[in-house]
Amino acid sequence: MINKRSLLASFINLPYSLFITFKGMYITLRYMFKPKVTLNYPLEKNPLSTRFRGEHALRTYKNGEERCIACKLCEAICPAQAITIEAQERDTDNSRRTVRYDIDMTKCIYCGFCQEACPVDAIVEGPNFEYATETREELMYNKSKLLHNGQIWEEAIDLRIKKNSKFY
């Protein structure tokens, strides 16, 4: 037996139900013909800002000599205390250079203070954001890893520093 009240209620709600259904279809069709905003990530990438702060790198001069003068300003200014530097004097010209330069990337907050504090632009944050690792120990960067990053990203880092020189 059909309940008369439920049958009456369904007829009363029919125009509203049709309205809501067609409104949803209209919205769906409208968005169907708009340009897509999602990217097929591994194949397509968004352009990065020139001020993006990614993986750290130590830079060298054109002759291959490292820029870091072991002033330890980056170590002192790091709010996360992620940087550890040990310095030693050279015998040739009595200038200081780093013996050990470590960054614990698990502590780093990517604030960019180390880059701003460096008087010789030795430590920079490059454009690389894809550096996932399988172990935590791989995120403990030593001097050789940082110098290697500097060699890989030197052109991109130079371009970014030139574009952003008025902001530093």
UniProtKB/Swiss-Prot annotation:
Example of a GO MF term = iron ion binding
Q: How does it sit in the membrane?
A: Peripheral membrane protein
GO BP field: aerobic respiration
User: Does Cell membrane appear among the keywords?
Assistant: yes
GO cellular component: a single term: plasma membrane
Can the keyword Transmembrane helix be found in this entry's annotation? no
Subcellular locations according to the entry:
Cell inner membrane
What is the catalytic activity of this protein?
a quinone + NADH + 5 H(+)(in) = a quinol + NAD(+) + 4 H(+)(out)
What's noted on cofactor binding? Answer: Binds 2 [4Fe-4S] clusters per subunit.
Q: Which InterPro entries match?
A: 4Fe4S_Fe-S-bd, 4Fe4S_Fe_S_CS, NADH_quinone_OxRdtase_chainI
Query: Which UniProt keyword terms apply here?
Result: 4Fe-4S, Cell inner membrane, Cell membrane, Iron, Iron-sulfur, Membrane, Metal-binding, NAD, Quinone, Repeat, Translocase, Ubiquinone
Annotated family: Belongs to the complex I 23 kDa subunit family.
> Quaternary structure per UniProt?
NDH-1 is composed of 14 different subunits. Subunits NuoA, H, J, K, L, M, N constitute the membrane sector of the complex.
Please identify the protein, giving its name as recorded: NADH-quinone oxidoreductase subunit I
Biological source species: Ehrlichia ruminantium (strain Gardel)
Q: What does the organism's lineage look like at the top?
A: Bacteria, Pseudomonadati, Pseudomonadota, Alphaproteobacteria, Rickettsiales
